[in-house]
Amino acid sequence: MSELLLELFSEEIPAFMQKNAEEGYLNIFTKIFEENEIFAKVQVFAGPRRITLHATHLPKITLPKEEEIKGPSIEAPETAINGFCKAHNVSKLELPTKLISNQLYYFFVKKTEEREIKEILPEIIIEAINKYSWAKSMFWGDYKIKWIRPLRNILCIFNGEILPMQFGHLTANNITYGHRLTDNKKLEVTDFEDYRNKLLENHVILERAKREAIIKTGLLELANSHELIIKEDNRLVEEVVGLSEFPIVLLGKIPQKFLELPKEVLISSMRTHQKYFCLFDKTGNFTPYFLFVSNGRFTNAELVIQGNEKVLSARLSDALYFCKQDIAKTLESRLGQLEAVTFHAKLGNLREKIERITDICNYIAPNNKDLITAARLCKSDLVSEMVWEFPDLQGIMGYYYAKHEGLNAEIAAAIKDHYKPQGLSDNVPSGNAALLALADKLDSLVGLMIAGETPTGSGDPYALRRQALGIIRIILENKLELNFNDLINFSINLYKDSSDENKNLIISFFEERAKFYFKNDYDIALINAVLDLNLIDTNFKLDELKEFLIEDAGKQLLNAYKRASNIIGDQKITGLVDASLFSTQPEKELFEVIQKISPEIIDSIADKDYKKALNLLSSLLTPITSFFDNILVNDSDPKIAQNRLSLLQNICELFDKVAKFNRL
């Protein structure tokens, strides 16, 4: 069996694109090989400067095959038949016909001759290279090929020989290159083993998994050796794997003078900008040490460490300067600057958004002065030097600046946490922070939907689905008893376009997100039966109804409700129950129980005691069963029949006070 080796050698490929490219090219090559009946074992390796394909077990020749291509029917217009003939370069007389569903159709038999595999590989390879779609790609120079970064070389070897192939301006050869910094020289290779070994000798580890294992092991061992803790950060690990061809883990130290900076600034500088790993002591406290991944061998580790510490110091010096500049101004004094920052083209600036958030906070919690102060100042840090340089520190810098100004801890914490939660795994804020976060998210949700930014399909550029889930989690986890319908009305009225159409759109969207949230724990029919805009009530009802319907009595009662509902059907029952028309004991007993429990159920619902309400409904089971077993609803006397239908209507209405049982 044969072996194919292909390397696309380029300028630096973005780290976050490499893993997807590895998986994408693997799928593409595998599929194209199979389409050509080449059943090979395929591997793809992605690194900072190369995408490599290794395929084994390729046949030396492709077998001849025939493929039938269906054409038009023999009764089709002559132009259609002639077009089919022209497409396949045959005359009508040469085309066989086949009977399909009592209709004759022309067919063309496409024959593929036996070919040597090396003859068809170049066209297959070029097709596969072009088929992968990078998230971003580019042209360069005067060349017509397009790729993620400029391609510099193509290595292509089949069974130890260069496979003649041209891709754009590049002609395939048997050359690769070693490590960019230390061994950037031409390496002639003969096959995959030779290729992998020569790369390793020249400080390039081909396999992504090996580089990842080296980094993870190095991080853990070096942290442990200094009795420090490194927090799991798979995303950063994946990124540095894509930045290094020959990774070596080293430990550095933050200069003492920068430790006066907030730890979040230090962490952001190291993680986001420098791709360093922060270290903590065994009690979880931040330490002045960090780990980093060096790309390539070196003779003097201390020199490499000093170089990285120097780069970090330069960045932290900027941060320290920005911090000192920022604290020269108060958060209040920055409000005017927010007028120059657009929230949305149709919704005005951030100063206007602040005013709406403040109004919503005042509506939710009147006379809460700390909350109102936090609402006024919560966006001020967006125009600070620090947040301009480190956008991920929004809210956090506002917290530190508020503390520096002497504002109380409740105000500072609300400013810090009002962006939370930013996903299902993020913590939900509490206290004033929860109310401020709710107001901010609600204003964004309402405003952006009024502006026509409602999510469609997979598109959600303003993360409104996440905003809605954040609102839901804040309400539920803080047990906020809110009239959400009134709250949405209030928020909508803060905008000029407060139409009923917009309100209905927002409520419908919010209800769908609530269903999405609850469906992890509850059946969708159960959710539909109890969902309303009071999420606390909804949650209580879901718990009680789920437990109730697990029991046999609950299942039997639901069946009794459905039977009553089916008998009524689409009939409009308007008359009251007339006890004087009862002629049997079962209907008398049933009516007596209904009259007895109706006010108790209403009181239980008012008290939000849904378990009691369901238990009261259970007392209907025996009389309902007796009624259905012994009574014919459609009596020959129309008055009696109508009265019995009214009785069943009473039952259904009583059930529906607790939940929409018709949706179960």
Curated annotation (Swiss-Prot):
GO terms, molecular function: arginine-tRNA ligase activity; ATP binding; glycine-tRNA ligase activity
Main location: cytoplasm
EC numbers: 6.1.1.14
Ribosomal protein as UniProt keyword: no
InterPro entries according to UniProt: DALR_anticod-bd (IPR008909), Gly-tRNA-synth_bsu (IPR015944), Gly-tRNA-synth_heterodimer (IPR006194)
A GO cellular-component term linked to this record: cytosol
Annotated keywords: Aminoacyl-tRNA synthetase, ATP-binding, Cytoplasm, Ligase, Nucleotide-binding, Protein biosynthesis
Compartments (UniProt record): Cytoplasm
SUPFAM superfamilies according to UniProt: HD-domain/PDEase-like
Root EC class: ligase
Biological process annotations from GO: arginyl-tRNA aminoacylation; glycyl-tRNA aminoacylation
Domain of life: Bacteria
Reaction(s) this enzyme catalyzes, per UniProt: tRNA(Gly) + glycine + ATP = glycyl-tRNA(Gly) + AMP + diphosphate
The UniProt record lists the keyword Nucleotidyltransferase: no
Family according to the record: Belongs to the class-II aminoacyl-tRNA synthetase family.
Subunit and partners: Tetramer of two alpha and two beta subunits.
Record-linked HAMAP family: Gly_tRNA_synth_beta
UniProt protein name: Glycine--tRNA ligase beta subunit
Organism: Rickettsia peacockii (strain Rustic)
